[in-house]
Amino acid sequence: MGEPEKRAGTHGIRCFAKIKVFLLALTWAYASKALSATYMNSMLTQIERRFNISTSIVGLINGSFEVGNLLLIIFVSYFGRKRHRPIMIGIGCAVMGLGCFIISLPHFLMGRYEYETTISPTSNLSSNSFLCMENRTQTLKPTQDPAECVKEMKSLMWIYVLVGNIIRGIGETPIMPLGISYIEDFAKSENSPFYIGILEVGKITGPIAAIWLGSFCATIYVDMGSVNTDDLTITPTDTRCVGAWWIGFLVCAGLNILISIPFFFFPKTFPKEGPEDMANETKNDEGDKHREKAKEEKRGITKDFFLFMKSLSCNPIYMLCVLTSVLQVNGFVSIFTFKPKYLEHHYGKSSSEAIFLMGLYTLPSVCVGYLISGFIMKKFKITLKKAAFISYCLGMSECLLSLCNFMLTCDNVPIAGLTTSYEGIQQSFDMENTVLADCNTRCSCLTKTWDPVCGDNGLAYITPCLAGCEKSVGSGINMVLQDCSCIQSSGNSSAVLGLCNKGPDCANKLQYFLIITVFCSFFYSLSLIPGYMIFLRCMKSEEKSLGIGLQAFCMRILGGILAPIYFGVLIDRTCLHWGTQKCGEPGACRTYEINSFRSIYLGLPAALRGSSYLPAFFILRLMRKFQFPGDINSPVTDHVEMMLTEKESEHTDVHRSPQVENDGELKTKL
């Protein structure tokens, strides 16, 4: 071929042959994948209610994303480095879009959402069967043969969400390992921390948009346009209320496909940033091709794979970094996945408010932390040892500060027969709760239905019938229940739909909880960039793509997949009252024992994150005991430039054994 054709094949379209343009596109891809992931997490409670499933199944759905990622992560990370990385990233974005579309499909296949209730939307006499009446048996509407529960197609529609999430995970696989290795290969070493900081900001701007989108969709009723919302008998804070969860997934699908387009125009390789490399651009391109061909002829791709795996496994700092990451991910996934649920049940917020607060008080501080951390690493040229120490101290500070949340507790909502007696005396979670009392035994009430009402006496009751209410006035959510025999001792005997509101003291504690969340998020994000640079610099240059992928593999199989499942199982154990499907089988949990829920939600992640600082401590010890190449006080960027220079000399001699230690690479032994 002629020289022009050769250069065109190497550098592609001129406007795309710049590392900063690729960085911009990759930042958008990071934002898009983070948008999809965060929106999925914000909608887990909505999905749980829509499909009437337990929290453990929701955890399985959430972990299915990691299953899809796990299927390909190591092979994509290693073999993808030897292929056209931008095109593989573009294909991944398009596959993510397909997965998001599949997740939204059940809405169009299931029909309207029918929540569990005995209450009729109007108060006419012919529809008052949900009230306390002697010699009449209540029924849950509509009823169905329990044997049909398994056969009902709609009961298994959550599998579409599971499969779509797996496909979304497959699509995300190439973005991080191939994108970061691409930047590491062609960016100036001194710019690398700053570029990674920009990518991390992209990972935050996506969630910010997702929080806004999730909060907006949660305010819209799931079947908007096809039902009269004035006839609904559930309030926004009701645990049966479901928002338009499917809209956001359609938005994510379109955005992922749109963002995939630019990656098909980037070249396979870039000229290295810097004037000295630009001058020798053609020479370096030819040298890279020659060296790659020589390596493949001598050892082969598969042999390299196992040699790199062995090298990484014998690198103690790398292995300790992976262990630290696994423990950190277990704690982070547990906190982030169920944070909306915690805000709803512990502080009495609606789904929309919980999603909005989670984003408002978490994401901006994380974004600022990433930017400041990346800027400091670039500006002051932090050494490897200082970076490790800074990361450790900031992480420990965040972990200790988060323990203050244990003091910001709210009490259980007083629910007669569950958390309190009918006389208002608080009951223990371990006690056998009895929802029937002398005031409602004559009413022949259903005991498994969830239709909560709040009485004038400040107590909530599971249904109007169990409150002993005999009359109703009004319609929809404005309905008022009167002549309630279980409330009469307070002087009034009326009730309104929904649980009673949390007190002002609980609202104040929520504000302190959110303020602590801001500082914890900021400290945690400050610690990530220095810690991640230690992780990147402890590997040989040619091992980075595989090393990143192997770390992601471990984090997903030991954290991303398992954490939401076992965490969901533990949360289910704190459930006080399960919902009921139309066929009578248990559905989603309607209310939790708050003290037990809080202990699991805050305690388990604190234990996991706290234990992660033990291997981190050994990393500090190893870095102090062993000498790094060159001056031990040299900055991270100088260290990387040395690695790149010596990597070049290594490639010049293709017969050199991979077992030989390179003077410019980190080699430590326990």
Curated annotation (Swiss-Prot):
Cellular compartment(s): Cell membrane
Residues bearing PTM Phosphoserine: 634
Domain Kazal-like: 433-488
Membrane topology, Cytoplasmic segments: 1-20, 81-86, 185-203, 268-311, 378-381, 537-545, 624-670
Membrane topology: Multi-pass membrane protein
GO molecular function annotation: bile acid transmembrane transporter activity; sodium-independent organic anion transmembrane transporter activity
Disulfides per UniProt: 439-469, 445-465, 454-486
Listed GO biological process terms: bile acid and bile salt transport; bile acid metabolic process; cholesterol homeostasis; heme metabolic process; liver regeneration; monoatomic ion transport; multicellular organism growth; sodium-independent organic anion transport
Chain spans, region Disordered: 276-295, 647-670
Family membership: Belongs to the organo anion transporter (TC 2.A.60) family.
Primary role: May mediate the Na(+)-independent transport of organic anions.
Protein name: Solute carrier organic anion transporter family member 1A6
UniProt source species: Rattus norvegicus
Phylogenetic placement of the source organism: Eukaryota, Metazoa, Chordata, Craniata, Vertebrata
Gene symbol of the encoding locus: Slco1a6
